[in-house]
């Protein structure tokens, strides 16, 4: 178990966006969550209005990462560049993890996947506002963040159905499942984000050596997720103490809005991280 609060600044402005001058504030409207209210969870089994590619190479990333991807060609075809999305925050909520990690790892393209419409809109606006704030700063400003948040985006998606539509085999380096819906009732367990069937898909898009992070404040859910990950042949447990100095794990524990709420309530956080194993070698035929 990983427990104990960490310091975090809740704030109402975009965090960790830089402080702006009074003139810049007039130019920039920072989104506020109270205008993006929606239910805490969504039914993943109903058909939502979702756009997703038939296969990863057909995904147009130019609207998400305009600094890294060119727009589709005149004939509608897409030219894939060398950069790929490598980190995915599944059920990213209001984007706290993404905004914390983006300036720490400006060379990594990271994507939040969120099924709720209003929450996705909030994160989209939050990223746009933060990018604009960065563009208003002088190049030599101490508040300028590496990458200017051009490496982060969000998409409305049902990760339980469409992960392989967005990501090729072995494309992802890190996948985060932070404070997911616990689905307490037994009949609802099939809707949990970690199941044997779903782990097969996560193992497909996660490269060997990649890490899957889980954090929750619900002990039963922690034990459920850890049990299924331990049982899967393509994942191996990483002792949490070996990641004690990992800024990514610290952000996973403390940067999300849910994580900060748990800290304010002095609750426990349960952490389990697993590494993707190498694919088993095929035995030579006699």
From Swiss-Prot:
Keyword Nucleus (UniProt): yes
Can you state the subunit structure given in the record?
Forms a complex with TRM82.
Q: What are the UniProt keywords, alphabetically?
A: Methyltransferase, Nucleus, RNA-binding, S-adenosyl-L-methionine, Transferase, tRNA processing, tRNA-binding
| Pfam families noted in UniProt | Methyltransf_4
Q: In which pathway does it act?
A: tRNA modification; N(7)-methylguanine-tRNA biosynthesis
> Where is the protein found, in the record's own terms?
Nucleus
Enzyme Commission no: 2.1.1.33
Which InterPro entries has this protein been placed in?
A: SAM-dependent_MTases_sf, Trm8_euk, tRNA_(Gua-N-7)_MeTrfase_Trmb
Q: Which residues bind S-adenosyl-L-methionine?
A: 91, 114-115, 158-159, 178, 256-258
Question: Could you say which protein family the record assigns here?
Answer: Belongs to the class I-like SAM-binding methyltransferase superfamily. TrmB family.
Q: Which domain of life is it from?
A: Eukaryota
Which reactions fall under this protein's catalytic activity? guanosine(46) in tRNA + S-adenosyl-L-methionine = N(7)-methylguanosine(46) in tRNA + S-adenosyl-L-homocysteine
Instruction: State the top-level EC class.
Output: transferase
Where are the annotated coiled coils located? Answer: none
Cite the active-site annotation.
181
Its source organism is Cryptococcus neoformans var. neoformans serotype D (strain B-3501A) (Filobasidiella neoformans)
Q: What is this protein called?
A: tRNA (guanine-N(7)-)-methyltransferase
Gene name as annotated: TRM8
């Amino acid at each position: 178990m990983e427990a104990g609060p960490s310091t975090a600044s809740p704030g109402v402005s975009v965090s960790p966006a830089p402080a702006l001058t009074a003139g810049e504030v007039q130019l920039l409207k920072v989104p506020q969550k109270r205008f993006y209210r929606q239910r805490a969870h969504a039914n993943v089994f109903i058909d939502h209005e979702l756009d997703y590619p038939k296969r990863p190479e057909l995904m147009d990333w130019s609207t998400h990462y305009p600094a890294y991807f060119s727009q589709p060609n005149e004939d509608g075809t897409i030219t894939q560049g060398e950069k790929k999305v490598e980190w995915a925050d599944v059920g990213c909520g209001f984007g706290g993890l993404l905004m914390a990690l983006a300036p720490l790892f400006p060379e990594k393209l990271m994507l939040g996947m969120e099924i709720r419409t209003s929450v996705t809109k909030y994160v989209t606006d939050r990223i746009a506002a933060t990018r604009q704030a960065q563009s208003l700063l002088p190049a030599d400003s101490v508040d300028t963040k590496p990458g200017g948040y051009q490496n982060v985006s969000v998409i409305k998606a049902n990760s339980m159905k469409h992960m392989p539509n967005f990501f090729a085999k072995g494309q992802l380096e890190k996948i985060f499942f932070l404070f997911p819906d616990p689905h307490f009732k037994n009949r609802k367990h099939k809707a949990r984000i970690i199941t044997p069937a779903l782990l097969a898909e996560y193992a497909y898009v996660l490269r060997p050596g990649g890490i899957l992070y889980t954090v929750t404040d619900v002990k039963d859910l922690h034990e459920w997720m850890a049990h299924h990950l331990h049982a899967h042949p393509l994942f191996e447990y990483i002792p949490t103490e070996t990641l004690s100095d990992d800024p990514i794990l610290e952000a996973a524990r403390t940067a999300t809005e849910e994580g900060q709420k748990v800290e304010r309530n002095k609750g426990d956080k349960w952490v389990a991280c697993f590494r993707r194993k190498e694919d088993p070698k095929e035995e030579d035929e006699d």
